[in-house]
């Protein structure tokens, strides 16, 4: 998979991609590709940061100090999309129209509200186009 430059896309990255990059022992090939994706400035949401942190504590056995550094890094290097009333109400509409789960609808709504054109996720339908503007991509599938 080729990773486009930030000038060519505004990408939102789901927590599963971050976790492959941050917990390298899971799958070395996926970890390498995920690391390339997150090396570029990306869009994340508060929900993604929370999911990454809880998994780093549980599975990655990271210390609270390391978690604090992860949080700082997210906020200093990437655009953090808020989880506010507008995003939550858009998620309701997405559940109605696209049949996303509750948590997935919040991810998609945050990506849309932040102006993302690509959503990297292993958990959603590859190549799905949402609202004619957001393409869901599973970067681990062969093109």
For each predicted feature, which ranges?
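Acidic, PIN/NYN-like endoribonuclease modules and their adjacent C-terminal/linker elements
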Residues: 1-6, 108-143
């Amino acid at each position: 998979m080729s990773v486009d430059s930030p000038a060519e896309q505004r990408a939102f990255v789901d927590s599963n991609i971050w976790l492959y990059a941050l917990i390298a022992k899971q799958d070395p090939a996926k970890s390498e590709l995920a690391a390339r994706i997150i090396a570029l400035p990306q869009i994340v949401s508060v929900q993604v940061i929370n999911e990454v942190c809880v998994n780093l504590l549980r599975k990655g056995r990271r210390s609270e100090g390391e978690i604090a550094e992860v949080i700082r890094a997210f906020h200093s290097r990437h655009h953090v999309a808020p989880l506010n009333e507008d995003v939550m109400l858009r998620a309701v509409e997405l559940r109605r129209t696209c049949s996303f789960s509750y948590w997935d609808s919040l991810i998609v709504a945050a990506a849309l509200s932040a102006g993302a054109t690509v959503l990297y996720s292993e958990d959603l339908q590859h190549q799905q186009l949402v609202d004619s503007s957001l393409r869901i991509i599973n970067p681990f599938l062969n093109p």
